[in-house]
């Protein structure tokens, strides 16, 4: 390209150009021709145009061609221009200026400079923006001249600028706009990522989405690790193939790198070992197993060649030697630990065998008793009452006996599984009851059901509805008590007395025959009759003397029924007024008199923890009544038991075989049924505390 004059001469004929300038109206916007602004610069004058992408930053002004052409606007455009008004900016070609002068074009000097500057800006904008060029040409020339200008542009091939740093030519078309899409040559090419992982053959990557070739799985996270996770979860055989291929590649790379010593160096630092070592060893084991089974794997050839070239056989021998040494050290350590554990156990057993206690009288007595028990022969085993014996003894119906015998362990008679109960059902009352669903218990003789599965409640049911079965249960209880060593009956007197009072029995009333609608009158026991008769006789006389030993006042006898309610007192005294008082014999009439006589003895009273000076009486409820207080004794049960233990300890100190005497145990049980004879250790401790 030449200067601006040559450009005008090449684009327009001289006559047309002069006529267009002379015939232009006052409304032509000259500012639309000038594109000089603070944001505009020559395409080759700054470093902003060194890259091809910088040419897309220019945008056409939205207000071009809108302002009117006037001298004020021309002057304003001259003043606002950032170019120097000196003649240095003018073209040095004087030939074209002479041509203009020869053709008689008379213009002002300032207007001439404006025209030259316009042509220079036109040349620059022609290379930068096609849209601005079209706007300027459409505003400056008529349609005829615009067509001619386009024809001249087609014939002239402009010289393309060259980007100096890159050496790439600028875009060939000067008509590219900012809105148009950039060309392929102008955008830098993105380096394609290498996909060397063997997982990629199982996936297709389309538009940044990886799709599995075997199922409908797709993901935008196009990474080999995620794809391997999919194969591991849904295509296990392919996943194993990928892992084996990865291991082969890693092993080959590791061996070719010359770092084979790190592969089998057990003592080396783990951080320096490659992360795929464990996986490689697993692959080697798999390949070895395949070779033993007669299967040939294509990776075996690679391994054999690598081992032959790099001499891994020696490394394997070293590894085996190190492993054997490590195993020997581990076995030796395990043997030492076992020996230490055995020694500790022996020491603990020896310490547990030696009793650690002080040498005092209580401990010596306990040791003596322990030695005697070991020297005495063991008593013969007492036969236990089994369920079969009870069932055979009692007369059950055939169907009930069959259900009881056929019921498996953990189920009821109906075969329903039952949860394991904590309580042992050794009481004979359970022969008449069976387990039902929902932890219920049912009677085998009727439709009675209850959730309170306790032997006492079940006995009350038998007592109220099945008298014969209740008597059998009481008989079996007595037999079991004797066989288990619980000598003597229970509190039979109190039980019979309570049953008699609640039943409303009368001493003089004979028992009536049973009827279907009314229950029978309970039979009066002989012991209860004697107690009632003696109580009536004492109430008639103010003082009753028995063998001159114990004096019981009338006031004390009046309080014997203080523990009973009014209804129970009336029930107990029914028919007593017509009873004749029997003459007392030399022998005691009942057990209570015998007990009171025994209490008079000083040694026995001290044994029972009671004083001899204070008279003692017992009411119908079994409560001890003192004559002075006329109320039940308020002594603490624990204190009484301690006093009894001390007295028994003194007797045991005089005769050490006292506790093993069966008659002495029966005697103590008769005196105090509620008192339990303590062990030898407790008696020895009580004896030491006394002294």
Curated annotation (Swiss-Prot):
Q: Where is the composition biased (Low complexity)?
A: 31-46, 171-183
Keywords, in A-Z order: Metal-binding, Repeat, Zinc, Zinc-finger
Q: Which GO terms describe its cellular component?
A: NELF complex
Domain of life from the UniProt record: Eukaryota
Enumerate the Gene Ontology biological process terms.
negative regulation of transcription elongation by RNA polymerase II
Is the keyword Transport in the record? Answer: no
Specify whether Kinase is a keyword of the entry: no
Q: Where is the composition biased (Polar residues)?
A: 58-79
InterPro entries linked: Znf_BED, Znf_C2H2_sf
Task: State the phenotype upon gene disruption.
Answer: No visible phenotype.
The residues listed in the UniProt record as binding Zn(2+) 2, with positions renumbered to this chain, are: 443, 446, 461, 466
**Binding of Zn(2+) 1, residues:** 212, 215, 230, 235
Single annotated GO MF: zinc ion binding
State where the BED-type zinc fingers lie: 194-242, 424-473
Q: Where is this region: Disordered?
A: 18-97, 171-195
Task: State where composition is biased (Basic and acidic residues).
Answer: 47-57
Q: How does it assemble?
A: Interacts with gex-3.
Recorded protein name is Gex-3-interacting protein 13
| Species whose genome carries this gene | Caenorhabditis elegans
């Amino acid at each position: 390209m030449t200067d601006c004059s040559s450009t005008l001469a090449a684009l327009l004929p001289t006559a047309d150009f002069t006529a267009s300038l002379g015939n232009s109206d006052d409304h032509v916007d000259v500012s639309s021709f000038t594109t000089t602004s603070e944001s505009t610069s020559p395409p080759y004058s700054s470093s902003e145009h060194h890259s091809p992408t910088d040419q897309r930053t220019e945008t056409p002004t939205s207000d071009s061609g809108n302002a009117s052409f006037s001298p004020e606007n021309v002057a304003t455009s001259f003043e606002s221009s950032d170019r120097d008004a000196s003649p240095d900016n003018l073209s040095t070609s004087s030939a074209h200026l002479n041509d203009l002068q020869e053709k008689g074009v008379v213009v002002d000097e300032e207007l001439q400079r404006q025209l030259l500057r316009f042509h220079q800006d036109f040349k620059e904008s022609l290379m930068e923006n096609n849209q601005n060029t079209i706007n300027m040409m459409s505003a400056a020339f008529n349609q005829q001249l615009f067509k001619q200008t386009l024809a001249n542009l087609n014939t002239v091939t402009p010289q393309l600028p060259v980007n100096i740093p890159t050496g790439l030519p600028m875009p060939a078309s000067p008509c590219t706009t900012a809105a148009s899409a950039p060309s392929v040559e102008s955008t830098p090419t993105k380096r394609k990522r290498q996909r060397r992982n063997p997982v990629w053959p199982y996936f297709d990557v389309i538009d940044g989405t990886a799709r599995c070739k075997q199922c409908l799985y797709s993901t935008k996270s196009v990474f080999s690790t995620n794809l391997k996770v999919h194969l591991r979860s849904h295509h296990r055989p392919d996943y194993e193939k990928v892992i084996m291929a990865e291991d082969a590649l890693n092993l080959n790379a590791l061996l070719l790198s010359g770092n084979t010593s790190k592969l089998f160096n057990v003592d080396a630092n783990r951080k320096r070992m490659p992360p795929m070592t464990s996986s490689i060893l697993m692959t080697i084991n798999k390949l070895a197993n395949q070779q033993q089974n007669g299967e040939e794997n294509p990776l075996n050839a690679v391994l054999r060649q690598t081992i032959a070239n790099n001499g891994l056989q020696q490394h394997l021998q070293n590894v085996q030697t190190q492993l054997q040494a490590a195993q020997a050290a581990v076995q030796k350590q395990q043997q030492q630990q076992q020996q230490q554990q055995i020694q500790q156990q022996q020491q603990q057993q020896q310490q547990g065998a030696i009793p650690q206690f002080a040498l005092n009288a209580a401990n010596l007595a306990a040791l003596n008793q322990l030695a005697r028990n070991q020297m005495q022969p063991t008593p013969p085993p007492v036969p236990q009452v089994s369920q079969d014996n009870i069932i055979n003894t009692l007369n059950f119906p055939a169907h009930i006996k069959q259900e009881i015998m056929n019921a498996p362990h953990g189920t009821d008679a109906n075969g329903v599984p039952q949860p394991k109960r904590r309580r042992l059902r050794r009481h004979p009352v359970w022969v008449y009851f069976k387990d039902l669903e929902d932890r219920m218990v049912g009677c085998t003789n009727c439709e009675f059901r209850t959730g309170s599965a306790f032997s006492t409640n079940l006995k009350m049911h038998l007592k109220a509805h099945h008298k014969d079965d209740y008597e059998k249960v009481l008989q079996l209880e007595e037999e079991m008590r004797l066989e288990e060593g619980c000598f003597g009956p229970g509190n039979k007197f109190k039980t019979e007395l309570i049953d008699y009072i609640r039943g409303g029995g009368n001493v003089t009333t004979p028992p009536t025959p049973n009827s279907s609608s009314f229950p029978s009158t309970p039979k009066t026991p002989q012991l209860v009759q004697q107690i009632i008769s003696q109580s009536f006789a004492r109430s008639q006389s103010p003082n009753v003397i028995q063998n001159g030993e114990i004096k019981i006042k009338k006031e004390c006898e009046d309080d014997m029924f203080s523990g009973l309610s009014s209804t129970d007192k009336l029930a107990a005294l029914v028919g007593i007024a017509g009873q004749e008082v029997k003459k007392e014999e030399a022998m005691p009439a009942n057990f209570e008199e015998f007990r009171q006589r025994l209490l008079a003895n000083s040694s026995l009273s001290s044994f029972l923890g009671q004083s001899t000076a204070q008279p003692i009486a017992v009411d119908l409820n079994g409560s001890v009544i003192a004559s002075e207080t006329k109320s039940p004794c308020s002594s603490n049960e624990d204190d009484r038991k301690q006093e009894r233990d001390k007295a028994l300890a003194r007797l045991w100190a005089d005769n050490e075989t006292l506790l093993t005497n069966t008659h002495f145990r029966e005697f103590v049980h008769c005196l105090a049924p509620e008192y339990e004879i303590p062990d030898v250790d407790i008696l020895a401790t009580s004896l030491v505390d006394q002294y």
